[in-house]
């Protein structure tokens, strides 16, 4: 499958982020956000989605991790949209259920051009490492709205918060992989409207 590479650079008063992704990669990653737990989750997304991701973020972590996490979502969303191009031949939809020990998460994606997000999480701790658990939803929202996708993410059950979030990011990677895969039987885009 041919490469689909996008580079995005974004600088604001709060963050500076540069990224390069290949949607049809091997799951290679080199991710540095300054937030260890977040790096770990993004590495999992890349590996399990077979998406190559190089990303470096410098943010105002002396304030907290909110701006960095959200802006990484913005940049990855923009990268994803750019790499997809005209969306011809992609399957459009992707769904994945991923277990992580006692936890089970699901992510469903529609590369629709209509950004929307639904999250159903019940985390029982406020923080893992240096990352607030509420920022999982902020990241997913920024990703979805900047990529132009509908995204539903849910933790069906679990006790360990690390396991729950890890299952979400693995499921995200796998759902993305399924949605962007191309099918030679699809003529144009997967829509009766003729556009996504």
From Swiss-Prot:
It is found in: Cytoplasm. Its EC number is 4.2.1.19. Keywords: Amino-acid biosynthesis, Cytoplasm, Histidine biosynthesis, Lyase. It catalyses: D-erythro-1-(imidazol-4-yl)glycerol 3-phosphate = 3-(imidazol-4-yl)-2-oxopropyl phosphate + H2O. GO terms for biological process: L-histidine biosynthetic process. It is an enzyme of class 4 (lyase). One of its GO terms (molecular function) is imidazoleglycerol-phosphate dehydratase activity. Its main location: cytoplasm. It comes from the Bacteria. The keyword Nucleotide-binding does not apply. The keyword Plastid does not apply. One of its GO terms (cellular component) is cytoplasm. InterPro entries: IGPD_sf (IPR038494), ImidazoleglycerolP_deHydtase (IPR000807), ImidazoleglycerP_deHydtase_CS (IPR020565), Ribosomal_Su5_D2-typ_SF (IPR020568). Transmembrane segments: none annotated. Gene3D superfamilies: Imidazole glycerol phosphate dehydratase, domain 1. Pfam families: IGPD. Pathway: Amino-acid biosynthesis; L-histidine biosynthesis; L-histidine from 5-phospho-alpha-D-ribose 1-diphosphate: step 6/9. Belongs to the imidazoleglycerol-phosphate dehydratase family. This is Imidazoleglycerol-phosphate dehydratase. The lineage of its organism: Bacteria, Bacillati, Bacillota, Clostridia, Eubacteriales. The gene is hisB.
């Amino acid at each position: 499958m041919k490469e689909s590479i996008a580079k995005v650079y974004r600088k604001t008063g709060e963050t500076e982020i540069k990224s390069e992704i290949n949607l049809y990669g091997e799951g290679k990653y080199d991710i540095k956000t300054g937030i260890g737990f977040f790096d770990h989750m993004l590495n999992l997304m890349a590996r399990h989605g077979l998406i190559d991701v190089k990303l470096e973020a410098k943010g105002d972590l002396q304030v907290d991790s909110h701006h960095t996490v959200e802006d990484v979502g913005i940049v990855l969303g923009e990268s994803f949209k750019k790499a997809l191009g005209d969306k011809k031949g992609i399957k459009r939809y992707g769904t994945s259920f991923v277990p992580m020990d006692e936890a089970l998460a699901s992510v469903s994606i529609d590369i629709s051009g209509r950004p929307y997000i639904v999250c159903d999480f019940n985390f029982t701790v406020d923080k893992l490492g240096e990352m607030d658990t509420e920022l999982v939803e902020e990241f997913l929202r920024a990703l979805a709205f900047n990529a132009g996708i509908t995204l539903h993410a849910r933790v069906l059950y679990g006790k360990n918060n690390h396991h729950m979030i890890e299952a979400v990011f693995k499921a995200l990677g796998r759902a993305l992989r399924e949605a962007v895969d191309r099918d030679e039987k699809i003529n144009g885009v997967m829509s009766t409207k003729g556009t996504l």
